[in-house]
Each structure stands twice: as C-alpha cells, then as structure tokens.
C-alpha cells in the first residue's frame, strides 16, 4: 500500500506509509540521539513529551521502512505556521533511527527520489535544522538545500530546497 521507490536490486526497498501506533512507539525507543537533541533544541521539549501528540495524530505521520525495518518517521505539509514558517511549497520533517546506517546508500537514493517527486508538485521544501546536527546538515546539503541563519536563535538555520 505504501509508496515504493525501487533501485535496480529490489532486495532493499524503501516504503513510506501512514504510521501505526506500534511504529511510533518503536521509533521512540530507537530515535538517533542527535535527532532527539534537535527536537528538544527546536521545540524546547524532549522527544518523549511529543509522543502523546504523535500518537493522537498518527494519521499525519509517515513511517519510512526498508524491507520492514523502521528507518524513521516524517511527513510534509503544504503550509504550516509553526516556528513562524510559511511556504507556498511544503514544510518537510523527518527523524531517523539508528537503523538508517544499515541502509544508508538506499536511503540516500530514496531521499533524492522523494525530493524530486515533491519538487514536481511544489516549488520548494523548507523547515529548520539545528546547525550542530552535522549529519542532518550534510544530508540536507546532499539534497540541495540552501541555509539561512536565524537572526534570533543561535545554531538554528532555516533551509530551503528549491525546484531547479
């Protein structure tokens, strides 16, 4: 049922589908520490304090899996006003588990394909990133992001990935 993006070898297949409560709970036990720190920095609350919201709104969360292994959760919204952001494109968010390391090449290929698909439908993808989460910054740079420092919060960068 989930959207599948293949590579030549179909053994490693990434899917994205509506998350279940089980996915959210599994994710909460396996979130990468750098992503948990970023959630707390951006929102002011530890990740565990967001669990109730995620479980209540599970239909708005997507689970990212490779051959059934949970790699992360995320979604995109056409517009969102959180953190003062507005975009005619989409505001995208994604948090990952440590399992993504075991599927790194396929995940990066899938990410490029997802960005391409989103940019066919929307003019850009945007959000914020903790500049100290170097792996996240490198990932966004790989996807073609441009970064802009927040004038009021040290270490918070806004990013945008635009259609070319």
What are these model-derived regions, one by one?
Residues 3-45:
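Short amphipathic alpha-helix that is part of the acyltransferase structural core
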Residues 39-60:
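Active-site rim helix/loop that mediates acceptor-substrate recognition in acyltransferases
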Residues 63, 68-85, 91:
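Conserved beta-strand in the GNAT
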Residues 85-101, 157:
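Conserved acetyl-CoA binding element of GNAT-fold acetyltransferases
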Residues 103-117, 138, 142:
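Conserved acetyl-CoA-binding loop-helix of GNAT-fold acetyltransferases
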Residues 121, 125-141, 151-153:
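Conserved beta-strand-loop-alpha-helix junction that forms the acyl-donor binding cleft
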Residues 153-164:
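C-terminal "cap" of GNAT-fold acetyltransferases
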């Amino acid at each position: 049922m989930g959207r599948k993006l293949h590579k030549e070898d179909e053994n490693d297949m990434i899917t994205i589908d509506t998350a279940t409560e089980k996915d959210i709970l599994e994710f909460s036990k396996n979130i990468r520490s750098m992503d948990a720190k970023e959630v707390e920095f951006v929102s002011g609350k530890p990740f565990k304090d967001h669990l109730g919201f995620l479980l209540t709104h599970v239909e708005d969360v997507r689970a990212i899996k490779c051959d059934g292994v949970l790699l992360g959760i995320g979604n995109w919204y056409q517009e969102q006003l959180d953190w003062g952001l507005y975009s005619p494109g989409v505001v995208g968010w994604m948090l990952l588990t440590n399992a993504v390391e075991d599927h790194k090449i396929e995940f990066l290929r899938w990410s490029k394909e997802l960005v391409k698909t989103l940019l066919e439908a929307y003019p850009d993808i945007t959000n914020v990133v903790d500049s100290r989460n170097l792996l996240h910054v490198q990932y966004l740079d790989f996807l073609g992001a441009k970064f802009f420092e927040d004038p009021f919060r040290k270490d918070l960068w806004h990013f945008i990935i635009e259609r070319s």
